[in-house]
From Swiss-Prot:
SUPFAM superfamilies: ClpP/crotonase (SSF52096)
Subcellular location: Cytoplasm
Lineage: Bacteria, Pseudomonadati, Pseudomonadota, Alphaproteobacteria, Hyphomicrobiales
Reported function: Component of the acetyl coenzyme A carboxylase (ACC) complex. Biotin carboxylase (BC) catalyzes the carboxylation of biotin on its carrier protein (BCCP) and then the CO(2) group is transferred by the transcarboxylase to acetyl-CoA to form malonyl-CoA.
Gene symbol of the encoding locus: accD
Name the record gives this protein: Acetyl-coenzyme A carboxylase carboxyl transferase subunit beta
Reaction it catalyzes: N(6)-carboxybiotinyl-L-lysyl-[protein] + acetyl-CoA = N(6)-biotinyl-L-lysyl-[protein] + malonyl-CoA
Principal location listed in the UniProt entry: cytoplasm
The keyword ATP-binding is assigned to this record: yes
Family matches, as HAMAP family: AcetylCoA_CT_beta
Amino acid sequence: MNWITNYVRPRINSMLGRREVPENLWIKCPETGEMVFHKDLESNKWVIPASGYHMKMPAKARLADLFDNGEYESLPQPKVAQDPLKFRDSKKYIDRLRDSRVKTEQEDTILAGLGKVRGLKLVAVVHEFNFIGGSLGIAAGEAIVKAFERATLEKCPLVMFPASGGARMQEGILSLMQLPRTTVAVDLLKESGQPYVVVLTNPTTGGVTASYAMLGDIHLAEPGAEIGFAGKRVIEQTLREKLPEGFQTSEYLLEHGMVDMVVKRHDIPETLARLLKILTKKPVSAANDMNGGAIALAASA
């Protein structure tokens, strides 16, 4: 026991009235360097108030924000094999899983819920980027497949919010197997006649982009999101060319026809509701806002 650390320092701190400062009390905007109080950021849906920069939004917060009154049924996390390859790099994979579970309070990167958005029933699937980079492994793949099956059973649309670096390297070929599995799940939902909409968030890359993230009937994207397969630096080194400014951003992909709409986070629930009501042929209130025409155009494309 270190008596200075465990006894003397706490006594001095209490005498002087000093308090331990929690981590992440202030959060720095990567774009402008602005410091934002964490509660202000959370209340603004993790969007920097001054610049409008969209920070990564926790999966639980996104589901609560999406569904009416924050009410939804959490879909169960399927049980799968843990660390089947007994993988180890600089750290044991099983330890990485344990640390990520403590950090995020989730079993794995995928959270799925069934609820209503502006009165319309749907299943939403969200990646938690803070869980090993939102990577796609066996557990995530199984959770996604089960979510598509539930949407098919409920005869309702599914909305996907990817945020991922791609396939989980610690699971090797078992991770890559999730690409065709999730692709088949998308096809089964579409065969049932239900819409599949993807809301691309920052970042959406790698094997996730190569599979279910780019198979939607309609693709929305948050402002400034990085979307692509390989990273910009890898592409530049391979081609030995400088890439255009803003390459792989949601705005660039919108301009080049890869994304249907770029939608601010605050507008996503309303935009999704309008789109899905058009796609499912349900009554839609008159679109008086500027996005009304774009929504109708995207849905009819």
